[in-house]
């Protein structure tokens, strides 16, 4: 893959930034694409742009605001509480988001001569999002190839690893401190370690604490 080109679906968060560093190691040329779907914190887009600029990555932002018209949710509406009731999808789930994001990323990839698409979806720390499942990604990969008659390959480096292992991967890629300090995972829009209270921050911190304990134990 070293001689090929890839497009990374990029939000500026921990997972997609780790995937960006992974792609930079795997491919000769990498571009990033971010989607503006009127998410609650526009800082997410600014954060992604700043990271791409710092890493020298060509960055495209696509307007997907129609998603908010079709599927209002807690990620786009300040009047909706972030909740996750047992047996129900979290209020942060956006119907069709990864389906649309990966489809538009594929269109962009074909236009820029890339056949590889990288996304940070994960089934291990799966929050109940059906569009983060491996079966969905594999199915969409086939559909995209048929729809555009093009040999796309969707890569999911984080699919079978948990948050602690994602931190480990960022460390192996030499990006641990960068990811910890400069990414935005927090639902409340706080860069770095975040608010510590929202579900995204709690998951991120639990993974970080586990990895740091493992790393310390390995060094003793």
UniProtKB/Swiss-Prot annotation:
Pfam families named in the record: QueC (PF06508)
Signal sequence, start to end: none
Pathways involved: Purine metabolism; 7-cyano-7-deazaguanine biosynthesis
Annotated positions binding ATP: 10-20
Cofactor (UniProt): Zn(2+)
Top-level taxon in the UniProt lineage: Bacteria
Listed EC numbers: 6.3.4.20
Any one GO MF annotation of this record: ATP binding
SUPFAM superfamilies: Adenine nucleotide alpha hydrolases-like
Record-stated family: Belongs to the QueC family.
Role according to the record: Catalyzes the ATP-dependent conversion of 7-carboxy-7-deazaguanine (CDG) to 7-cyano-7-deazaguanine (preQ(0)).
Protein name per its UniProtKB record: 7-cyano-7-deazaguanine synthase
Organism in which the protein naturally occurs: Bacillus cereus (strain AH187)
Phylogenetic lineage: Bacteria, Bacillati, Bacillota, Bacilli, Bacillales
Gene: queC
